[in-house]
């Protein structure tokens, strides 16, 4: 989805569960 996860992603991975990387920001699905 659109809400951000409050983190940036490195190497295309996000630490927060159910979040995906749209560099440089992680978004909830």
Swiss-Prot record:
There is a cross-link at residues 1-29 (Cyclopeptide (Gly-Asn)). Pfam families: Cyclotide (PF03784). It comes from the Eukaryota. One of its GO terms (biological process) is killing of cells of another organism. SUPFAM superfamilies: Cyclotides. Keywords: Cytolysis, Disulfide bond, Knottin, Plant defense. This is a cyclic peptide. Transmembrane segments: none annotated. InterPro entries: Cyclotide, Cyclotide_moebius_CS, Cyclotide_sf. Disulfide bonds join 5-19, 9-21, 14-26. Probably participates in a plant defense mechanism (Potential). Binds to and induces leakage in phospholipd membranes, particularly ones containing 1-palmitoyl-2-oleophosphatidylethanolamine (POPE). In vitro, displays cytotoxicity against cultured cells but no hemolytic activity towards fresh erythrocytes. The presence of a 'disulfide through disulfide knot' structurally defines this protein as a knottin. Belongs to the cyclotide family. Moebius subfamily. This is Cyclotide mech-3.
């Amino acid at each position: 989805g659109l809400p951000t996860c409050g983190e940036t992603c490195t190497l295309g991975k996000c630490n927060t569960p159910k979040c995906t990387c749209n560099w440089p920001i992680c978004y909830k699905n």
